[in-house]
Design a protein with these regions (language model features):
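C-terminal motif of bacterial Sec signal peptides marking the signal peptidase cleavage site
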Residues: 15-17
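Sec-dependent signal peptide recognition
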Residues: 2-8
Length: 476
């Protein structure tokens, strides 16, 4: 089926290229493990060689494009960009990714990243000279075992897509394993079942997206030390595990191409929802990028909405088109119908984190379940949440009691308890001085929710606490 779709897309591209110039050319983003993607990957390697040689003041350079996502607050004696040593020297459009806690990220995360990698794609297309270049994706959510291995060019130490500050086993050609593999196997089907846009956007961000960022940089155990050439520090968080440096690892783009692919699969499904102009205006974000000629482009909410459902590319197994049957997203605060305050520390690999009863007067089919957490330092690894799990039964991600996996990628981004929160996007802090993160699950409405957390990777010494549980109305 996939080969048939790819063939049809290729035929469509051929016919498009032979039509009038007014018609939009369509590009095909391909699986980075496929033979069909080899020319695009080579073009990307060629482009990154050129982009890495450009100065960081050039908007089409590797450094500038990566810094649009984020860049460290301070880099004393910056060896890669002498004109940037601290946050007062930020250049136009730098530090604009949607890793904030303002609430606006719950609508803009997927949309902003779609626009971001689309502009990088255009720059690579022109820089490489490959006129039909499309950004390859790393399809680690596929069921093929080969797709669990990082694609070869990104592992080749002689290529310009290679980065040393990654999990050693990935660079050595070993497949994703352990907690991260469990997360992919269990979470992907769960994500595709979500019917609420805000919850889908947030869940994909905090599970597969964040989980893979952490795994690529640090693995399941977070016990490897790597030198990060961007921050110029040695730590146990590789380049991809740190929001401030993630965009500098070339695998970032193949990773986010796959996240965008998941987004489109959901949009095309019966569960997909679309945002409106009013919703974008009510949750403003900077959509500020550079085109392939290095020209600054600022997009209004109207322009963003006109583009995001009418992109000029498809995936080799997904057509990127507007789903005319999709419903409108319900964006905004939803009424809390029940609250519980377990205030329990997560000190065991597996333990109960509380019980919350539904409101007896609530008659909706679904509710939104929120788990409020606090911690001193960002927890590593992955955690799995189970609902009404039978005592003595193994914890498996294909169990009907599995709610989902959570990661804490970026949870300490902009920590206001020290001098790191100088550029905005500050992490929230609890009354007792701890960092905070809230996870949301879309669940069926039942009488009682007994919740269990299972740590499938990482360590236990992070002072993680579940403070509060809430149930919210699924509808506005």
């Amino acid at each position: 089926m996939k080969k048939l779709l790819f063939g049809l897309l290729s035929i469509g591209l051929l016919f498009t290229s032979c039509s009038t110039e007014e018609e939009q050319v369509r590009y095909v983003r391909k699986n980075a493990h496929s033979i069909e993607a080899e020319a695009d990957i080579q073009a990307m390697n060629t482009a990154f060689e050129i982009m890495k040689q450009k100065g960081c003041e050039d908007p089409t350079s590797w450094y500038y494009q990566a810094a649009i996502h984020w860049v460290p607050t301070r880099i004393y004696d910056n060896q890669l960009c002498a004109s940037y040593t601290d946050w007062t020297e930020l250049k136009i459009a730098w530090d604009e990714c949607t890793h904030s806690h303002s609430g606006a990220e719950e609508i803009n995360f997927l949309i902003w990243h779609r626009m971001y990698i689309w502009h990088l794609e255009k720059i690579v297309r022109k820089t490489s000279g490959k006129e039909d270049f499309a950004l390859p994706y790393w399809g680690y959510t596929n069921y093929d075992k080969l797709d669990k291995v990082m694609p070869p060019m990104w592992r080749d130490s002689t290529s310009y897509l290679y980065e040393e500050s990654r999990l050693d086993s990935l660079n050595a050609g070993y497949p994703i394993n352990g907690a991260a593999l469990r997360m992919l196997q269990g979470q992907y089907p769960k994500v595709m079942e979500i019917t609420d846009y805000q919850t889908f956007n947030k869940t994909l961000d905090q599970s597969i997206h964040g989980g893979m960022h952490n795994y690529i940089g640090s693995g399941n155990a977070h016990n490897e030390e790597h030198y990060n050439k961007i921050s110029q520090k040695t730590s146990k968080t590789g380049m991809m595990s740190d929001v401030a440096t993630a965009g500098f690892d070339p695998i970032f783009w193949a990773h986010h191409s796959n996240i965008d692919r998941i987004f489109q699969k959901w949009l095309n499904s019966p569960n997909g929802q679309k945002v409106t102009l009013e919703q974008l205006q009510d949750n403003p974000w900077k959509y500020e990028f550079f085109d392939e000629n290095g020209k600054l482009v600022n997009y209004s909410a109207e322009e963003v909405l006109a583009i995001i459902y009418n992109m000029d590319y498809d995936y080799d197994d997904v057509v990127v088109t507007e789903n005319l049957k999709a419903t409108t997203a319900q964006i905004g605060p939803k009424e809390v119908i029940s609250t519980a305050t377990p205030n329990v520390f997560v000190s065991e690999q597996t333990q109960s984190i509380g019980t919350i009863d539904n409101n007896e007067n609530y008659n909706g089919v679904k509710v939104l379940l929120d788990i409020f957490t606090t911690f001193e330092n960002q927890p590593s690894g992955l955690y799995e949440i189970y609902l009404n799990h039978p005592e003595g039964q193994e914890f498996e991600v294909d169990s009907p009691t599995f709610l989902g996996a959570i990661s804490f990628f970026g949870a300490n981004h902009g920590d206001p308890r020290n001098t790191e929160c100088l550029k905005g996007c500050c992490s929230p802090v609890s009354e007792d001085g701890k960092l905070m993160t809230v996870f949301t699950f879309e669940v069926n409405s039942i009488d009682t929710y007994n919740l269990t957390i299972h740590r499938s990777g990482g360590h236990e010494d992070f002072d993680l606490k579940v403070n509060k549980l809430t149930l919210r109305d699924y509808n506005l």
